[in-house]
Amino acid sequence: MSQVIYTFTFDKSVFRLASHAIRIHSHHTLAFESVSATALKGMEIFLCAEDPKALVEEAQELDIPGDVRVTLRIPLSQKPMFQQARDLAMRYTDHPVPIRLAFVIALLAVFHGTFKDCSYVPIAEPD
């Protein structure tokens, strides 16, 4: 599968945000999700957000470089959606949206668009 690969660093607070977003996305799908799959789902949610400006503003506060390194893998088939999310975010900033900021926006969107209460996980009835 052809993909675009981005590698960047961020602060430990964003690492915690990513860990929780992955957990929430995994609970929602009932599968172990990767950081890339979680970010892509967040970008999808962001594109449909009622208030994308609020997500961008919140993400800008969290967009801090640091020592934690991540590799984000975007399949070429999803690159247009990824770019569309960055373009939407750019409407609310005075500069191009760097990949790290797009990543933080996506993680926040997972929280705002998936579960409000992530403690509930549907459990199938025993056979």
Show which residues each predicted segment covers.
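Surface-exposed, Lys/Arg-rich phosphate-binding patches that contact polyanionic backbones
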Residues: 12-37, 60-62, 76-101, 124-125
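Short, basic amphipathic alpha-helical segments that act as recognition/interaction helices
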Residues: 29-57, 94-121
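Intrinsically disordered, low-complexity serine/threonine- and proline-rich regulatory segments
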Residues: 1-6
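Short, positively charged interaction helices/loops
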Residues: 46-84, 112-127
